Amino acid sequence: MGVKLNICLLLLLVAIISSQGFNLRKKEDSKDEKPFGNYRRGSPCSNYEGSCTPNHIPCPPGSHECRQLPGCYPGVERCCCQY
């Protein structure tokens, strides 16, 4: 009986360790590396309540392009400021 208990405990331990390793390999989709319209802290664009928007997407309603404000990735994004 002692041998069966040891085998059961060993199998339980292996199952727990295996499931923990599987959880570590899951990709977290909630974190986006470069979200649209994110605010660059401390940049002139964000200081004037602007947001960096990709060049191929128009500025959101109620905002306009602020060419004079840097702070977004050049050639990829532009600053869209509130009116």
UniProtKB/Swiss-Prot annotation:
Q: Propeptide ranges, please? A: 22-39
Location of the region described as Disordered in the Swiss-Prot/TrEMBL record:
25-44
Instruction: For this UniProt record, give its keywords in alphabetical order, as a comma-separated list.
Output: Cleavage on pair of basic residues, Disulfide bond, Nematocyst, Neurotoxin, Secreted, Signal, Toxin
The answer to whether UniProt assigns keyword Acetylation to this entry is: no
Principal location: secreted
Q: Which residues form the signal peptide?
A: 1-21
Describe its PTM? Contains 4 disulfide bonds.
Regions annotated as coiled coil: none
Q: Where is the composition biased (Basic and acidic residues)?
A: 25-35
Annotated GO CC locations = extracellular region; nematocyst
UniProt subcellular location: Secreted; Nematocyst
Record has Disulfide bond as a keyword:
yes
Q: Name one GO molecular function term.
A: toxin activity
Q: Which family does it belong to?
A: Belongs to the Cnidaria small cysteine-rich protein (SCRiP) family. alpha subfamily.
> Briefly, what is this protein's role?
This recombinant protein induces severe neurotoxicity on zebrafish larvae (Danio rerio) at a concentration of 230 mg/ml, but does not show toxicity when injected in blowfly larvae (Sarcophaga falculata). All fish incubated with this protein died within 16 hours of exposure. Has also been claimed to be implied in calcification, but this function seems improbable.
What is the protein name given in its UniProt record?
Small cysteine-rich protein 3
